[in-house]
Amino acid sequence: DTRSLTNLIRDKGAPKGTIAFSKNGKFNISKLTRSTIKWGGLKNLDLAEVVTTPKNYIWKGLQTWKKEIGFKKNRKNLFHVVAIDYGIKKNILRYFSDFKCKVSVVSCKTSAEKIIDLKPNGIFLSNGPGDPAATGKYAIEILNKLIKKNLPIFGICLGHQILALALGGKTKKMKLGHRGANHPVKNLIYDKVEITSQNHGFVVVEETLPKKIEVTHKSLFDSTIEGIRLKNKPIFSVQYHPESNPGPQDSVYLFQEFINNMKKNAKKKRY
């Protein structure tokens, strides 16, 4: 049952496995076993290029769901965010609409030059599947060019990991990934604990981070990094999902911090 599987994963780490379905209830166990063993796992696998949008688009402006009114549409745009899509969740886009942002969603291999041509007030690095080091083979070069523009940047999950790689850090596959909606995280800046939603199997390695990076959040389960920021620029990221729906919503303030960074940066001439 699920409890015995949980104990197995806890003791031995995440194993390979197959969940199979058959209408007649008959299975070729040897064939399923061979295919399971043959599967190479997520390491070195770039899945962002598989799930990214095939065509750049502008989000239709729907906000997060609210009782009585449902999904209301944002009618006023104060800022323009370009979201790099590594596998973006729609609720992230809805939150940006809540904060009066126009969002241009671009594919994960869109060049830095094309992104800058859109004249964004800020750059968002989305969540997504796969090994960040594999996605980083093309994403790091793009991101480093964007970092030099001194624009506000905000990353979530895979976006957080790619930001760490671009800034000189490294990532690794975890023995036990973080899955669930009740992970306690300590905000080291405000000295507060947040309950967060998480779904990741890779993590940023703290000892590889250069001095220009400050660790802002840590897991209270295993002390792994849950958030970072660049000390001299309006750039930060978190490993978990502040946009999680129906919750927890302890970390929605991160969207406001990104908005505040764009407000401050808007006073400077960028284009």
Tell me the role of every PLM-derived stretch.
Residues 128, 233, 243:
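Flexible loop residues that form catalytic
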Residues 2-118, 130, 147, 245-247, ...:
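RNA-binding accessory domains that recognize and position tRNA/RNA substrates
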